[in-house]
Amino acid sequence: MTQPDLTAALALNGPDATLKLYRDWAATYDTTFATDMQYNLPAHVARAFRAAGGIGPVLDIGAGTGLLAQSLRDMGLTDPIDGLDFSTGMLERAAAKYLYRTLIHADVTQTLPLSRQYNGITSSGTFTSGHVGPEAFAPILAVALPGALFALSINQRVWTENGFDAALASLQHENRIHDLRLIEVAVYGTAAAAIDPGHADDRAWITLFRAT
């Protein structure tokens, strides 16, 4: 069996392929990817959320194994965090860390089985190649309270190509979001160059805004 890796993840095409890759990767994701590649993006998102005054309850989109929630806890957030992911294998790993109030198995591009209850929406690594596009903004906004703070990482490789810039501009124009600002960050640390030089220099926008 081919070992799941970043290249395979960024080339995903369709829900079946996504479920298979993350089912196979879940057990080793934290070590073979997050640690070895110095995957700093979850910490960047958590830091931006906290610095902007983010509070809970928080919905962590694409929660994975809980890396972003762990960073939020490490930075002092004690409010409830709920985690949502398409992969049950990844959610099982997250559950074992006892970081979340509840975990939800759902497709973020569809209407979510949740009420409008969140003061914060976070996401790290979900809005990238082969994953989720701006079509997820509407379902996420539907569960955010007025004034809720969003802190979402969006890989720069897909920012314009996949229409994230246009989608956010449209949401601003429709007065559905406000106070949009971008923070540029490196996705990985220096160790990534020896493991995956093709992606070691990847950059992302931490996209901060509030629901109207």
Please place each PLM-identified region on the residue numbering.
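Class I S-adenosyl-L-methionine
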Residues: 176-212
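Class I SAM-dependent methyltransferase SAM/SAH-binding core
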Residues: 59-111
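Conserved beta-strand signature within the Rossmann-like core of class I S-adenosyl-L-methionine
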Residues: 147-156
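A short SAM/SAH-binding and catalytic strip from SAM-dependent methyltransferases
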Residues: 119-133
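A short glycine-rich, Lys/Arg-flanked "PGG" loop and its adjoining helix->strand segment in the class I
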Residues: 135-146
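Conserved SAM-binding loop and adjacent beta-strand
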Residues: 30-46
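Short "lid" loop at the C-terminus of a central beta-strand within the Rossmann-like core
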Residues: 155-160, 185-187
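N-terminal, positively charged/glycine-rich alpha-helical extensions of SAM-dependent methyltransferases
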Residues: 1-28
